[in-house]
Design a protein with these regions (language model features):
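Extended, composition-driven regions rather than compact fold-specific motifs
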Residues: 2-264
């Protein structure tokens, strides 16, 4: 293997495994951000040792049942065992920030109708409790790829916000399925990134990426030293992933495609 190939291998995203832990946490603070997100700070001694080094890491958030009871599982050699075999409602969320000295974890909840997490966040008050599982692992992505491309809707904005706080690339392109006013208020300073606002991902037809792909056809992609990140609705993410890997011949190791939700 040449030195160049070794260097490229070292720059590929690296997976890190974590010991699976479940934690009970309590709401410490809650504020409304950009009119569409609740930023909730959780605290608790159980957060000691929490790790989430990847910008789009996720924890499994478990919600209380209709009676208010919060269930935590037992981790055994045979796997995860839930009390009475009942698994509570759960959703994946990105850790936005973690203060290890104070054991305070911050996550942003996108507000939308009919969502168990959104409904809980809307009602949440200081002292309310949740259970968290994971992260099971992290994908650590170099911050200084020369070219970086990010496509997401509102659900991906917390991970993107975290990424933009540390990214060092000179050539960053953002294609965002969100209202420009909300996106600008939420993300704040995006430095020199070039952003294309595509309208809210909640709008009818927003999950069809045909028009976006036509736009992307005009974008020149480098052959090396790049990273592409795609998130949002499952079918749209798959079509975009197929486009970049198949039609645009990008290396699948440098294309991160993750479905954050699925249209029903």
């Amino acid at each position: 293997m040449s030195n160049s190939e070794k260097n490229n291998l070292r720059r590929l995203p690296q997976r890190i495994r974590h010991e699976l832990r479940f934690r009970q946490v309590a709401v410490a603070e809650k504020i409304l951000v950009a009119q569409r997100f609740y930023r909730i700070v959780f605290s608790g001694d159980a957060l000691a040792g929490f790790l989430a080094p990847g910008f789009d890491d996720h924890v499994k958030v478990f919600f209380p049942d209709a009676t208010g009871e919060l269930r935590l599982p037992t981790v055994t050699e045979q796997g995860i065992v839930w009390q009475d075999g009942v698994r509570p409602a759960a959703r994946d969320y990105t850790p936005l920030d973690f203060d290890a000295e104070r054991n305070r974890l911050t996550m942003d909840f996108y507000i939308h109708p009919g969502g168990v997490a959104s409904d809980w966040a809307s009602r949440a008050q200081p002292g309310d409790k949740l259970a968290l599982g994971g992260p099971r692992g992290s994908l650590v992505v170099a911050e200084d790829y020369a070219f970086q491309l990010y496509v997401c809707d509102e659900t991906g904005l917390p991970a993107l916000k975290r990424r933009l706080q540390t990214v060092q690339a000179a050539d960053i392109h953002l294609y965002l399925l969100t209202d420009a006013e909300i996106g600008q208020a939420y993300l704040g300073d995006i430095g020199g990134a070039q952003v294309t606002w595509l309208g809210s991902g909640d709008l009818p037809g927003a999950q069809d990426p045909t028009a976006l792909i036509t736009t992307l056809d005009t974008l020149t992609l480098p052959d090396e030293d790049y990273f592409i990140w795609l998130t949002g609705e499952g079918q749209r993410v798959k079509r975009l992933s197929d486009y970049f890997i198949g039609q645009r011949r990008r290396d699948d190791a440098s294309v991160r495609a993750v479905a954050y939700w699925h249209q029903k």
